[in-house]
C-alpha cells in the first residue's frame, strides 16, 4: 500500500517496484477558505489560478500525482506517455475505486476500529 508518486520516485531511483491501477483507490482533496476571511475574493482568485490546467500539467512533470482538472487531458497539455502515468488519466481512473465521503461520514468510527483491529492482529 502506498502513494503512486512515491512508488514512481523509488522506481526512478532503481527500486524494483510496480503497481496496478486495478487495485487503486482515488481519494478526494479540496481547498477551503475560512468563513469570514478578510481576503476571500483574493483567495478565490488564487484557487482559480491554481486550478488552471496549464499549471496542473506543469506540476505533473515533477511528480505523478495526477491533475484534478480533466482539461489537462482534454487539451493534451501533457505528453501522452507522462499522462498515462497519472492516476486521474481517464484510462486509469476508470479502474479505481473512488472513496465515498458520504460512506465515511456515516461509518468512520466503526471503520477505524475495524481497520485498527485488522492491522494489529
Predicted features, each with a name:
Residues 25, 29, 34-95:
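Mature extracytoplasmic/periplasmic domains
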Residues 2-6, 22-24, 36:
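Histidine- and/or cysteine-centered catalytic micro-motif in compact active-site loops
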Residues 1, 37-38, 50, 102-106:
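Residue-level detector of secondary-structure boundary/capping sites
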Residues 3, 68-71, 100:
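Helix N-cap / beta->alpha transition motif
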Residues 1-18:
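Ligand-binding pocket segment of bilobal, Venus flytrap-like solute-binding proteins
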Residues 4-7, 43-47, 56, 108, ...:
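Extracytoplasmic/secreted envelope proteins and their assembly/folding machinery
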Residues 10-11, 50-54, 63, 115-119:
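Sec/Tat-exported extracytoplasmic proteins
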Amino acid at each position: 500500500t502506498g502513494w503512486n508518486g512515491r512508488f514512481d520516485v523509488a522506481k526512478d531511483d532503481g527500486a524494483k517496484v510496480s503497481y496496478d491501477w486495478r487495485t487503486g483507490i482515488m481519494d478526494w482533496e479540496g481547498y477551503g477558505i475560512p468563513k469570514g476571511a478578510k481576503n476571500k475574493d483574493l483567495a478565490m482568485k488564487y484557487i482559480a489560478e491554481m486550478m488552471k490546467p496549464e499549471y496542473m500539467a506543469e506540476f505533473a512533470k515533477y511528480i505523478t500525482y495526477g491533475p484534478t482538472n480533466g482539461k489537462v487531458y482534454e487539451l493534451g497539455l501533457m505528453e501522452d506517455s507522462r499522462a498515462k502515468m497519472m492516476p486521474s488519466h481517464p484510462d486509469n481512473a476508470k479502474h479505481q475505486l473512488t472513496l465515498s465521503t458520504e460512506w465515511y461520514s456515516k461509518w468512520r468510527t466503526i471503520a477505524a476500529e475495524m481497520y485498527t483491529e485488522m492491522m494489529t492482529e
